[in-house]
Amino acid sequence: MIRRVVQKDSTGCGIACAAMLSGTTYRRAKLLAIDLGIASDRPPYYTSSRDLSLLLRKLGLEPSRGRRLSRWESLQCLSVVGINHNDETDTWHWVVYVPTANGGYVLDPKKSIKSARRVDFGRMTPCSCIPVLRPNKSFKPTPLRGPA
């Protein structure tokens, strides 16, 4: 079961999604992201599809290549999904899509979202996704700078 992780920083949604999928804490995922040069100690920082894929791999997951997404119905597998693209800033919000026999649900790391599982797909406009296939069997945790 994947547990929702709430982002601790205003722009930490990608880090929170990586933490959810890997079963680690936000703090541990953020420290790794800082070590990889993806994030900084203080926001704002933004995770691109490439950065997020790297972080997912370093956390022991096997992301496949990111792709554009325009309809939730076309998603069939566990994925990190970019939603609600802002044309002015060229930014989006990362969430985790979990497929089920009933169509799936979204785990949203945004603190103001109170429900653990979102199914209000009409309020979330997908723009891209990174399918996450399966755990990497040869995974060895990356050493961190400090305590996790």
Features from the language model and the residues they span:
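Active-site nucleophile-adjacent alpha helix/oxyanion-hole segment immediately C-terminal to the catalytic cysteine
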Residues: 1-43, 54, 58-59, 140-148
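Conserved active-site-adjacent core of cysteine acyl-enzyme catalytic domains
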Residues: 24, 34-134
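Compact, aliphatic and Gly/Pro-tolerant "microcore" segments centered on a short helix or tight beta-hairpin
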Residues: 126-148
